[in-house]
Amino acid sequence: MRPNHPVAALSPFAIDEAVRRALAEDLGRAGDITSTATIPAATRAHARFVARQPGILAGLGCARSAFALLDDTVTFTTPLEDGAEIAAGQTVAEVAGAARTILAAERTALNFLGHLSGIATRTRRFGDAIAHTRARLTCTRKTTPGLRGLEKYAVRCGGGSNHRFGLDDAVLIKDNHIAVAGGVSAALSRARAGVGHMVRIEIEVDTLEQLAEVLAVGGAEVVLLDNMDAPTLTRAVDMVAGRLVTEASGGVSLDTIAALAESGVDYISVGALTHSVTTLDIGLDIVVAPPKAERA
């Protein structure tokens, strides 16, 4: 099942912060010395962002910011919005202004646009594979350091939903917590006593025996069914019988996700949405350049 809510907006402050870091990394101490050396300062250019392959678009705000942060007179225009389906050969945006600025910001803009569109595209593929079921697709915290907010936004652009943004969003008792705490019962009872009533508690289990203990002890609202095959997952969902929200996770691929979703599980979390993404191929093509270089 695909969520039908609109894509939640991404803060422009979050966009600018990430793009500033990327520009600083790329421009270094002296800026784009190649463009400065070869292109007169007064030269203007017009370029198009063109998709080289089909996919789902994400990251327009980052691409726009890459130019605006260097020169607010550069214009960035697009008829599209993040989440749009794009075809190979389609123009997704255009930029016009100082040629030096366009070339200096080009790679930063393309890096964000390609990376985030790659996440959105992969998310859509996983979502399409389970669209015939009630299961909802969600991401994980397996994100690129410093880019979590952007990457989780791209997941939403692709039709997925977000799991925890950080460790302070909810309690998620994993296998290592259980091992250190002394077992499922001890971990659950301490968690329930240690957080307020408004905090949701999820616990990870990897066997049906652990699941039975969770159901007997109580205290959790969500159970994460880790690395279970489809038949075992179906038995687990039957055991829960609607008493807890169920989430399947662990080694989920495009080849396996449909069978897992058909078990009746509520959510399927997929780390591969963000941790091993292939960039969507988008290029920037200069379409208008002066026939003769102007003097600075």
Curated annotation (Swiss-Prot):
The gene is nadC. One of its GO terms (molecular function) is nicotinate-nucleotide diphosphorylase (carboxylating) activity. The keyword Transferase applies. Substrate binds at residues 107, 140-142, 164, 174, 204, 226, 249-251, 270-272. Keywords: Glycosyltransferase, Pyridine nucleotide biosynthesis, Transferase. Hexamer formed by 3 homodimers. InterPro entries: Aldolase_TIM, NadC, NadC/ModD, Nicotinate_pribotase-like_C, Quinolinate_PRibosylTase_N_sf, Quinolinate_PRibosylTrfase_C, Quinolinate_PRibosylTrfase_N. Belongs to the NadC/ModD family. GO terms for biological process: NAD biosynthetic process; quinolinate catabolic process. The keyword Magnesium does not apply. It is an enzyme of class 2 (transferase). Its EC number is 2.4.2.19. SUPFAM superfamilies: Nicotinate/Quinolinate PRTase C-terminal domain-like, Nicotinate/Quinolinate PRTase N-terminal domain-like. Involved in the catabolism of quinolinic acid (QA). One of its GO terms (cellular component) is cytoplasm. Pathway: Cofactor biosynthesis; NAD(+) biosynthesis; nicotinate D-ribonucleotide from quinolinate: step 1/1. It catalyses: nicotinate beta-D-ribonucleotide + CO2 + diphosphate = quinolinate + 5-phospho-alpha-D-ribose 1-diphosphate + 2 H(+). It comes from the Bacteria. Gene3D superfamilies: Aldolase class I, Quinolinate phosphoribosyl transferase, N-terminal domain. This is Probable nicotinate-nucleotide pyrophosphorylase [carboxylating].
